[in-house]
Amino acid sequence: MNKSILENPKIILIVQGRIGSSRLPKKALYPLGKKTVLHQVLKNLKSVDVKDYFLATDYNSEEFFAPIAKECGFKLFSGPENDVLERFCLLIKQENPDVVVRATGDNPFLFTDAASFSIKRFLELNATSKVDYFTISGLPHGSGIEIFLGKSLLEAAEKTNLPYDHEHVGPALYNHPENFVSVFEPALEKWNFPKLRTTIDTFFDYKKAEKLYKILDCENQPNINSEKLIEVCNLDFIKYPILFMPNTQKGKGTGHFRRCLSLAEELNGFLFLDFNNKTELPEHFENLLENSNLWDENLIFGKENLKKLAENQSEKPFSLVVLDSFVTPKEKADFASKLGKVLSLDDGQENPEILGKINYLLDIIPSSKLKRSPNWKNTDFIPKPKNKKTEKVSQIKTGLISIGGEDPAGFTNLAKIALGKLGIKTTTVDVENPIPNLKEELYKYDLILTHYGFTAFEAKAAGAKVILVATTKLHKTLAKSEGFICLEKKDFKNKNKLKEIIKTLETENSKNQSDTKSQIDIEESSKTEASLKNFILDFSKTKEHFCPVCNSSNNLDKIIFRNETRTVKKCSKCHTIYLNIEKTPISDYSESYFFEDYKNQYGKTYLEDFDSIKNQGLRRAKIMWKLATHTAPAFSGENAKENCVQAPSQGSCFSAQKSSLENCVQAPSQETSFLTQENSSKEKRNLSPQTAPTLLDIGCAYGPFLAAAKETGFAPFGTDISKSATDYVSEKLGFPAFHGDFTITDFQKQFEAVSMWYVIEHFENLDTVLNKVNSLLKTKGIFAFSTPSASGVSGKFKTKNFLQNSPVDHYSIWSFKSAKKVLKKYGFKILKIQSTGHHPERFFKKSISKEKNPFLWNLILQISRIFKLGDTFEVYCQKISSNPKTKN
């Protein structure tokens, strides 16, 4: 018991900070609200009840921090810049505190209630036994503090010369358990959100902090309400930040900007403006911003700030970057792809290299002439006006001219004069004369003259007549392809031609413009208007996947397939085809996966199909046995008992990291290592469980291959992430099985064989998986797996359908070429490739029948086998070396 501390402890709070941060220099001086980040940190911490408050900085920062410390009621102390441990020790020697509370100057949202609780707990713990260091684990990153005994830190500094210990403070204590007692107490449930981040370590952190500060109204609050902060941090726009990047290039109008601005308002997203600051904004953009509800905190100005957002990030900072560029240039695509997964709206870009950096292409306005395919065309996202004409226009008396915010080609005045000569009274929409909520005002006019874009389709839906102007060649092409009348400048100078066009529009009541060859009819498009806002929000929550082998964001990877729900890429390094984007929810592999889902696909449940799967397993197990007989000593019984993996028991053969032994399902008999006595008597090979070569089946499901492997002579062991499956394997089949993630399980013995049957494609990270398999196998051990084949008839000749029909939980699609390259990288040599899944009916557009044409059927079957054109294949390989990342 530490009576001196308990009686009247002197507790001081030290905030550590400096301007020389390597990742974000001078971040403590960044504006936050009306003052600075450091102001908010110090103001917040003043509510923690201690004896005295200090700001411990370095000599170079002293002049910048002195006035802030004084204003906030903190005493300033200066010490070495890089030896932070020494800085703290000097202050402790000066003040001689019993207890020190340490916080950092880049955490403006620190939980002061958790800090006060921590002090109380630290004193309680020290009432019974000495605790040198205390902190709460599980708080949002940037919300906690550290507490330690002053004398203990001085002692720790004397004992360590490690640079890391001196660059920080706490490690000098908690990294030396032989000398000091440290307690990491789990956070209370209300604070336990370790995945949330509230610190300011990067420019992106700062931009997020600006939002949090405004939402929490920190300007008017004495300290942070932790529960409110957690609530806000779990809001969609904080958890899934979205960046909108419109085209703001001169001469491209305001349509792209207005769409992004509207979406940013609705989703509380960030808006990038390609200007250095607000003063450089053109008047039309400035007016639109002033009339919007978007916060200044949501604006990001200039390319330099855009670059800073990507700096020092372990992963892409934004959940989604939305491009609205008309035609996305290479530089913009490069920027966007470094910041988050990329969705582009109505993109006229056709260059495959640039499009390869765009994860999802959404075409809302029809663009049939483009030489590229989008993921999805959905004109229902075009906003539909609620106000519509009740009668068709028979005489055009009024017109609205809306050519965009800039009208660089000068159509507005030309059209106004030309239509005026025909007696049509016109109203113009421009920067100086905007019409709020223009979409709902269109029905008031007989004629709308605009360019190809939303307004054209909205006007059509409102019942007005529509004439478009050819602002660009592409706009002209698209307008004509959708059945709109499209005029060039010269047409407005031809009064007779224009008069004839107006007359045609007036007399086409029986054949309204909505009956032209346009791809869509807005009025009849859909009963309910699709929400672009909701689509973008949902898409922001979709995960971007990278090559499961190389596991890196490689913008050189080619996109080989797009559809409404997915994007598929091919790795430029290892040639693996992989799922880049998948919007459809992925199965959780619960019991229904093997029963209802399996039956829907195959007409029977997994257990009803057990014998058929087992028969295939017998063939596979025999191949594995044959390939290994002359190479793996244990297959002949040599040293088998020593190498045998035992069934889990009190002396378990493995322990699971992040798992307890309750995940390990016991085989019914503890007398044998793998088999019950009943099962042992049925073995075909003359090997006892102690001498049988061991086999681990990863993704064993309900155990048909385990049963086949046992009959072949193996001592089988299973693992699966489905608990119902491993329970069945243990209780019904009598084989030991482990429920959980095999990659984080510490198997203390190695196996002679490892198998994965239609499992390997389900792993998102194959690098981890293949390294683990290598470590599980003895040298010369056999690794066998089966998987869908990109080298088969469907993958080669019906690629689009093949990729379209690939299950949503298949992260990779293997080919013979990629298998050879990838397996070699992980220390395996392929011994045999078996092409399977032969389907003669898939060789022709029109399916052939085995019953009606048996000769052709069998001929194609033989061709498929000879040229290995099956839609699945099996790989049998041997471990020839340990991968550098693994340890035997």
Which residue ranges define each predicted feature?
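N-terminal nucleotide-binding beta1-loop-alpha1 segment
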Residues: 2-24, 241-246
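Short phosphate-binding loop-to-helix
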Residues: 59-123, 300-310, 327-328, 435
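Conserved core of the sugar-phosphate nucleotidyltransferase
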Residues: 67, 110-199, 204-215, 230
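A nucleotide-sugar donor-handling region in carbohydrate enzymes
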Residues: 225-226, 357-410
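Conserved catalytic-core segment of nucleotide-activated headgroup transferases in glycan assembly
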Residues: 255-259, 388-430
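Catalytic binding pocket for nucleotide-activated donors in carbohydrate/polymer assembly enzymes
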Residues: 456-500
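S-adenosyl-L-methionine-dependent methyltransferase catalytic module, highlighting the catalytic core
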Residues: 764-772, 782-880
